[in-house]
Amino acid sequence: MRTVKLSPFGLAVWDVDIAALSQAAADALAGLIAINKVVVFRNQSGGDSELVGFLKQLGPLTFTAGETPVAGAPDLNVVSNLGRSTPPRSVFHTDTSYVVCPPAFTALREVMLPARGGQTVFSDQVAAFLALPPAWRSGLANCTVQHRTTGLDGQSQTHDHPLFRLHPVTAETALYLSTPERCSHLSGVDPATSERLVSILYRRSIRASNLYRHSWKKGDVVIWDNRLTMHQADHSDVDGDRVLHRGMVMGERPIHAV
């Protein structure tokens, strides 16, 4: 296995076939993902069934209601700009945070890449937490955030999660947020203050110095730890068709950092 550190965080990996891993090797890679937050597996030749098999080695799979399943691989969903007259809307978020046990890992497999653009951008939520002033860390230590669904026809779901989340493997503390549209209330403060604080924390999280921008290549499989990151698709300068297949691994109930 050959690895290269990405900047400012993340890891690129060569000479690993995710379709041919022992369970022990998959367990080791789960730790590698947690440590590096984002891992890019280069030159993967497998398809949907191989991606599903790899993800199942990391844990039970989960699927977000309202997404479009991949034909022949219903555990995966399609991420695509095909047939759209306007670019898809994407903002920084963490996946499906409004359920009791949000996904621990999300993976994307390259299917079709545009001639230009279409990066996936990640924020380091551990660095975002560490950059908070000490008074903020202490003052917000016991806060929870109500996460909610947006945009799912006829469906509404909410759940409260700690603002400062402890990672069960690395013992790091992350600033656990999603897009402000999905963070409806911060505990212990009035609605106006809640909205202002969530907006400030969110903007601090997505400063340019805190972002890894992934430029896709043929054969890429990218997997990240939702407990430690947010992500966004950059559709601002896409020239051509962009199709990815996504799978998610169920996580644990978020733990308060103490």
Role assignments for model-derived ranges:
Residues M1-V221, N226-V258:
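Non-heme Fe(II) oxygenase catalytic core, chiefly the N-lobe of the double-stranded beta-helix
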